[in-house]
Amino acid sequence: MSENVMTLQVITPAGVVYDHHANYITARTTNGEIGILPNMISTITGLEIDELKVSRPDDETHVDYIAVNGGIIEIKDSLVTIVADSAERNRDIDVSRAERAKIRAEKALEVAKAEKKSDEIKRVEVALHRALNRLNVSSHN
């Protein structure tokens, strides 16, 4: 493998979501956004709910987008592994399902705020963030 190429694997309990070569990866970690290049220093860190951007070596102008709902990223040599609760490529996102999830979360958030249930507010805010992330990533089709 070329020194300018790495392998990215995104794995969820449902299986492998993504397994391709990449030139550059952008991810939002719990410490902020990072850009990942081949042969970077090894690290393991948590991921936020956000989009993952992958530049592939087979087409310099093409970027793959993946909705990642948190998880852990490990960078070691030229292998980047992400283990997440759930992840979807932009082309695989069911937009109408994501829109319904957003509407449900917004309604549940109104109720939780009216009832002043702080734990429920936090839970629903995460659900809303996931739905918005999926909608954002799906817009890159």
Curated annotation (Swiss-Prot):
Keyword Ribonucleoprotein: no
Keyword vocabulary terms for this entry: ATP synthesis, Cell membrane, CF(1), Hydrogen ion transport, Ion transport, Membrane, Transport
Topological category with respect to the lipid bilayer: Peripheral membrane protein
Keyword Nuclease: no
SUPFAM superfamilies, sorted: Epsilon subunit of F1F0-ATP synthase N-terminal domain
Record-stated family: Belongs to the ATPase epsilon chain family.
Listed NCBIfam families: ATP_synt_epsi, PRK00571.1-3
Function of the molecule: Produces ATP from ADP in the presence of a proton gradient across the membrane.
Protein's UniProt name: ATP synthase epsilon chain
Taxonomic classification: Bacteria, Bacillati, Bacillota, Bacilli, Lactobacillales
Gene name linked to the record: atpC
